[in-house]
């Protein structure tokens, strides 16, 4: 099967990179909101 390598790419991407990216984006959003409020 040609797509046999897909799980080895998608699992770290969804399991590690996506949560780290969303946490960083959320942290930046909170920080920017905190700066504008004060």
UniProtKB/Swiss-Prot annotation:
Entry annotated with the keyword Transit peptide: no
The keyword Transmembrane helix appears for this protein: yes
UniProt cross-references to PANTHER family, sorted A to Z: PHOTOSYSTEM I REACTION CENTER SUBUNIT VIII, PTHR35775
Transmembrane segments: 10-30
Protein name per the record: Photosystem I reaction center subunit VIII
GO cellular component: chloroplast thylakoid membrane; photosystem I
Encoding gene (name): psaI
Keywords: Chloroplast, Membrane, Photosynthesis, Photosystem I, Plastid, Thylakoid, Transmembrane, Transmembrane helix
Stored InterPro entries: PSI_PsaI, PSI_PsaI_sf
Source species: Trieres chinensis (Marine centric diatom)
């Amino acid at each position: 099967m040609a797509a046999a390598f897909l799980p080895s790419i998608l699992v770290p991407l969804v399991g590690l990179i996506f949560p780290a990216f969303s946490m960083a984006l959320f942290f930046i959003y909170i920080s920017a909101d905190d700066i504008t409020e004060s």
